[in-house]
C-alpha cells in the first residue's frame, strides 16, 4: 500500500533526523520562547482590540480599498496588470519564482516595465527558486535588479534554515499585494482540478501599502545594502477607501514568534467565530489550547486544510496527529479535496481578517521571514466569510469517529512526522 510505503519512509527519515540531531549536525535551530499569558482579552469588536494590534509593529491605518483575488485566473492579470501600469517603482518578493510558463508571464511584465524606465526590484528565495538562475539572468539583462535571498553556499550551510517565505508586490508605493500565491504553473487556472491550486491574494490600494513597502525593504536592504527611502518609494498616498489595514512583518530574529502571538491574541479575543484556511496546519501546543478554549466557550471554530491533494503528505500526517483533541473540544476540521489548497488566511468574528504567507507550522512561526495584510472591517470580513463558505462546498468534514479509526501504522507515521516537521 502507498500509505504503508510512506510510513516506512517516515520511519527511515526519522532515524536519520534523530542521528543528525544527536551529532549536532542539524541545520535548523528553533528559538526558545515563552508560553503566552493573555489575561482578560478584549473582544474583537472592542476598540481596545484594534488598538492592541498596533503592538505587532505597525499601526492600523485607514483609507484603504481591498480586493480579494481568488486563484490564478484572477491573481495573474491583477498582479501583471499592476506591473504594466507602474510608473515609478515595482518591488516583488516571492519564495518561488519558477522558470516556467507562469514565470515567463511575470518576467515579461517585469522586463517590459524596466525597459520603459520603471525601477524594478525582484527578490527570490534561494531554496524556493533554486532552479531559476537563467530566468533571473534574463531579467537582469533587461534592467531588472534581481537578487537571491540567502544564496546556498558550502561555507554558509549553517544558515540554510533562514528563508524568506514572503509573497509581496508593491507598485508605485501605493498598491500592494499579499497572500499565499507563488509564481509557478500550479498557481495558474481556477482550482478546477488537481493541476490548478487553490490560493488567495489581496490587492490593497492606499496607505497600508507603505507598510508592505517597508517589509519588502527589510529583506532588500539585508541582501543588497540598498536603503529604499524617499518619495519614489513612500509617496504621499491619498485615501482610496475606508478599510483599516495593517502590514504584519515576521522575521527570523523575532524569538518571541510574532506570528504565533498575533494569531494567539486574535483567537483568544474571538466571541463568535474563527474561520481559518491554512495549507500547513501544525500549530504548537499553545495555539491548539487557544483554539480549544475558544470552541469550549461557544465560538464557531472551523479550520480548513488540504485533503488528499496536499503537496507535502508528511505535513498532513503531522497535522492529523493533533486532530483528536481539537475535534473533541468542538473544533470543526474541513479537508479541501478539489485540489491543493495553499491559502493562509483567517477571519475572526466577521470583523478581523488576515491574508498572507504565514503557515501554522514551526518553519513559519519560528524560522522564516513572513508577511501578512490584516484588516479591521465588517464588509471586508463578510467577503472573506463568503469565500470561506464557497470553499466549504469542496470539503469533507473530519469527525472524531473517523479520526479514531486510524490504524496503528498510520498513528506511528503521524507521530514520527511530527518530529520531522520543523525540517520541512
Question: Which residue ranges define each predicted feature?
Answer:
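Bacterial N-terminal signal peptides
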Residues: 12-22
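Basic/polar N-terminal segments that are highly enriched at the extreme N-terminus
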Residues: 1-2, 27
Amino acid at each position: 500500500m502507498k500509505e504503508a510505503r510512506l510510513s516506512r519512509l517516515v520511519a527511515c527519515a526519522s532515524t536519520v533526523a534523530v542521528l543528525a540531531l544527536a551529532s549536532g549536525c542539524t541545520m535548523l535551530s528553533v528559538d526558545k520562547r515563552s508560553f503566552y499569558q493573555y489575561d482578560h482579552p478584549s473582544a474583537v469588536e472592542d476598540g481596545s482590540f484594534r488598538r492592541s494590534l498596533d503592538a505587532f509593529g505597525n499601526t492600523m491605518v485607514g483609507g484603504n480599498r481591498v480586493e480579494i483575488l481568488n486563484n490564478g485566473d484572477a491573481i495573474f492579470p491583477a498582479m501583471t496588470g499592476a506591473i504594466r501600469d507602474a510608473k515609478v517603482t515595482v518591488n516583488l518578493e516571492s519564495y518561488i519564482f519558477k522558470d516556467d510558463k507562469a514565470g515567463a508571464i511575470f518576467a515579461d511584465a517585469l522586463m517590459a516595465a524596466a525597459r520603459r524606465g520603471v525601477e524594478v526590484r525582484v527578490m527570490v528565495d534561494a531554496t524556493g527558486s533554486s532552479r531559476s538562475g537563467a530566468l533571473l539572468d534574463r531579467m537582469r539583462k533587461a534592467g531588472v535588479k534581481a537578487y537571491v535571498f540567502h544564496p546556498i553556499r558550502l561555507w554558509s550551510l549553517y544558515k540554510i534554515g533562514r528563508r524568506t517565505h514572503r509573497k509581496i508586490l508593491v507598485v508605485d508605493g501605493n498598491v500592494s499585494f499579499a497572500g499565499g500565491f507563488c509564481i509557478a504553473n500550479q498557481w495558474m487556472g481556477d482550482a478546477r482540478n488537481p493541476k490548478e491550486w487553490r490560493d488567495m491574494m489581496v490587492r490593497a490600494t492606499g496607505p497600508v501599502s507603505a507598510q508592505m513597502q517597508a517589509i519588502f525593504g527589510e529583506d532588500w536592504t539585508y541582501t543588497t545594502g540598498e536603503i529604499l527611502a524617499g518619495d519614489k518609494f513612500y509617496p504621499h498616498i491619498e485615501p482610496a477607501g475606508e478599510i483599516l489595514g495593517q502590514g504584519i512583518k515576521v522575521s527570523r530574529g523575532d524569538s518571541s514568534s510574532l506570528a504565533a502571538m498575533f494569531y494567539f491574541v486574535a483567537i483568544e479575543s474571538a466571541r463568535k467565530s474563527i474561520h481559518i484556511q491554512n495549507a500547513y496546519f501544525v500549530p504548537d501546543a499553545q495555539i491548539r489550547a487557544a483554539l480549544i478554549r475558544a470552541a469550549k466557550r461557544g465560538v464557531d471554530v472551523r479550520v480548513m486544510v488540504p485533503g488528499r491533494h496536499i503537496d507535502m503528505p508528511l505535513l498532513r500526517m503531522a497535522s492529523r496527529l493533533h486532530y483528536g483533541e481539537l475535534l473533541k473540544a468542538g473544533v470543526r476540521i474541513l479537508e479541501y479535496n478539489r485540489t491543493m489548497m495553499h491559502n493562509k488566511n483567517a477571519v475572526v468574528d466577521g470583523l478581523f481578517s488576515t491574508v498572507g504567507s504565514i503557515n501554522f507550522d514551526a518553519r513559519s512561526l519560528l524560522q522564516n521571514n513572513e508577511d501578512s495584510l490584516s484588516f479591521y472591517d465588517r464588509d471586508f470580513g463578510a467577503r472573506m466569510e463568503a469565500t470561506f463558505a464557497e470553499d466549504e462546498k469542496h470539503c469533507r468534514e473530519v469527525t472524531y469517529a473517523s479520526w479514531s479509526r486510524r490504524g496503528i501504522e498510520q498513528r506511528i507515521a503521524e507521530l514520527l512526522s511530527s518530529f520531522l516537521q520543523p525540517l520541512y
